[in-house]
């Protein structure tokens, strides 16, 4: 076999609570920011589809876990819903939620599938957002209590915990670029939200370590390598600034226990530093992780700015760089993202060379395609493009592992076609096709290919 992976390699996929569970307003669950935003502005959501039903995992969990086993998963990552487990954000636990999550965890283990559990995947309870969300340190403390509750309830069986999934995304979406609630454009508030998210992460890590639970705790970051247009110093500096803002603002605190000095100096120059309090530095140091999840979809290509900044305009990341459309790059036209498989190699070798080669795994990697019904043959979607996408990324991952990178697994996004926030079900990502009208599940060709790859621990 040409591409054989290490023994005990994690083969699986990932999803999140809000994107798959459905029953968003049932079972004792309170509203998240997404439920409220959809109520207020349904026209912003593709085809007017909100989070109420999604992929109905809440009702079909046993069937779906059987499909995971059929797809030869030995591991699977999903998230818990804070709004479902503790509807008021703090205080009483919802027994219906405890029962549901116990069923899911126990069934995964019964089928030989290791659960990887994320505490927060973009789904802020509205009662917490009304207090200011991550702008309010009271919400940081509440998250720590929520995390402790999760560890107490499920820590006897869950051995792989992740505090956040892609914590930079709610910062970008909610406070810079208007694709998450609360739809604010304000860099200073964005910096505060990012900083408090790191504090929330560290608070949860402290709680986990204090409980002396068996297993490991980490975080899932979407890492987008920043490539300069050229080696001209101005382009290189532009890429460095993009890397500081979008990658190292979370990567350095969770792996090194501190922020990059360059990032602190940069934010200070533009008067964008968040307010710090005594004890924050030690808290951040205490938030260093055991395991890093890496979500990789696309690179970020940048260049120095072609024009001067308008000094009257609000400060934004783009004051520091312009995006660069590299000629000839391979694109996914449905998502508008570049497909660049070597990026996965560059990420893990950077971790090896500059971050002490931490334990890590690919926690998401995938391709969303619109109107996959075009590719149905004999009742099955023949998504050869997804097989090609996965295999190319796995080849580069294999190369990094063979060169000493401590990468322990590969999880695809995603198991079943799911609800993708504002995009609804526009682009499909799953190994399993979901018919929205009937909720029928049908394994795609890529699912069969992945099952064979996982079973043989590699491919030719």
List PLM regions with ranges:
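Active-site region of glycoside hydrolase catalytic domains
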Residues: 1-45, 88-90, 98-460
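Aromatic- and Gly/Pro-rich amphipathic surface segment
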Residues: 31-66
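Generic alpha-helix structural propensity
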Residues: 56-63, 71, 80, 96-103, ...
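Catalytic domains of carbohydrate-active enzymes, especially glycoside hydrolases
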Residues: 60-81, 286-291, 354
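A short acidic, glycine/proline-enriched capping/turn motif at secondary-structure boundaries
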Residues: 74, 83-85, 122-124
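Glycine-rich, proline-tolerant flexible connector loops at the mouths of alpha/beta enzymes
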Residues: 80-93
């Amino acid at each position: 076999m040409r591409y054989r992976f290490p023994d005990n390699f994690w083969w699986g996929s990932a999803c999140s609570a809000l994107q798959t569970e459905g029953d968003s307003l049932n079972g004792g669950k309170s509203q998240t920011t997404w439920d409220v935003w959809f109520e207020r502005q349904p026209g912003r959501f593709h085809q007017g589809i909100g989070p109420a039903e999604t992929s109905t995992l809440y009702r079909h969990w046993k069937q779906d876990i059987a499909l995971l086993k059929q797809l030869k998963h030995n591991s699977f990552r999903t998230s818990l819903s804070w709004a479902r487990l503790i509807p008021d954000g703090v205080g009483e636990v919802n027994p219906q939620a405890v029962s549901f999550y116990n069923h899911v965890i126990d069934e995964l283990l019964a089928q030989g599938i290791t659960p990887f559990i994320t505490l927060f995947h973009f789904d802020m309870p509205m009662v917490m957002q009304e207090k200011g969300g991550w702008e309010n340190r009271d919400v940081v403390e509440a998250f720590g209590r929520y995390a402790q509750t999760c560890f107490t309830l499920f820590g006897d069986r869950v051995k792989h915990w992740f505090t956040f999934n892609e914590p930079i995304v709610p910062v970008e979406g909610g406070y810079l670029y208007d694709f998450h609630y609360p739809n604010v454009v304000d860099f200073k508030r964005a910096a505060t939200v990012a900083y408090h998210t790191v504090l929330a992460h560290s608070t949860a890590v402290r709680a986990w370590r204090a409980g002396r639970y068996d297993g490991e705790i980490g975080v899932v970051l979407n890492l987008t390598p920043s490539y300069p247009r050229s080696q001209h110093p101005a382009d290189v500096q532009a890429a460095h600034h993009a890397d500081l803002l979008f990658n190292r603002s979370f990567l350095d605190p969770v792996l090194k226990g501190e922020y990059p000095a360059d990032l602190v100096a940069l934010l200070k120059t533009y008067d964008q530093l968040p307010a710090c309090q005594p004890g924050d530095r030690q808290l951040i140091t205490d938030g260093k992780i055991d395991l890093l999840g890496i979500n990789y979809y696309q690179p970020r290509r940048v260049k120095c700015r072609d024009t001067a900044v308008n000094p009257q305009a609000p400060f934004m990341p783009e004051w520091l760089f312009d995006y660069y459309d590299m000629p000839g790059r391979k694109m996914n036209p449905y998502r508008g993202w570049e497909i660049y498989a070597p990026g996965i190699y560059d990420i893990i070798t950077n971790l090896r060379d500059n971050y002490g080669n931490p334990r890590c795994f690919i926690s998401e990697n995938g391709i969303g395609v619109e109107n996959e019904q075009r590719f149905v043959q004999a009742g099955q979607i023949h998504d050869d493009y997804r097989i090609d996408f996965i295999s190319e990324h796995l080849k580069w991952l294999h190369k990094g592992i063979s060169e000493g990178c401590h990468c322990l697994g590969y999880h695809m996004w995603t198991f079943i076609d799911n609800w993708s926030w504002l995009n609804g079900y526009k682009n499909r990502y799953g190994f399993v096709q979901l018919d929205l009208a009937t909720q029928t599940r049908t394994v795609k060709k890529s699912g069969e290919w992945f099952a064979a790859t996982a079973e043989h621990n590699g491919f030719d």
